Amino acid sequence: VLKLDIREVHYEMGESSTACCPIALALTEKFLGTHPSETSIWKKNGIPLFRGEVVKVFTEYTRFWHPIKNKIYEFNHDEKIQKFIIEFDDWYESSADMKTLPLEETTINFPKPTCVWKSELGLHQPQFL
C-alpha cells in the first residue's frame, strides 16, 4: 500500500468551503486527467468493492472559521495511478530545486492550490517505478 499524506497550507479557489474541492481532487485531475470518482475505490459497509493494491491519499484542510478536516481517498493501484507515480517521479528528477529538500517533505506549486506533500514511502524511490 502506497500512502500519500498531503497537507494543505494555502487554498484559494473561491469555493464556499475547502471541502468542495480538496487537494486530492486537484492533484488527481492534474496528473491523471480524470475525476477521482472514475478511479476511486467505493466502499459498501466499509468493505472495498475492488480488490488489489491500494493507494491512499490523506488530505487535511481548514478555513478561518472551520476546524481542521480530514478526508481519505483510496485509489486502485492501476495503470492510471502508476502513470501518476511515474510522472511525479519524472518531475521530481527534473527539478533542481526539489533535490535540495528533505525527501520526506516536498512542496509542489500549482496555480491553485499550493500544497505540501508528506510521503511515507517516497514516490521517487525505485521500488515504485
Label each region the model flagged:
Residues 1-129:
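Domain-length accessory/inserted modules outside core catalytic folds
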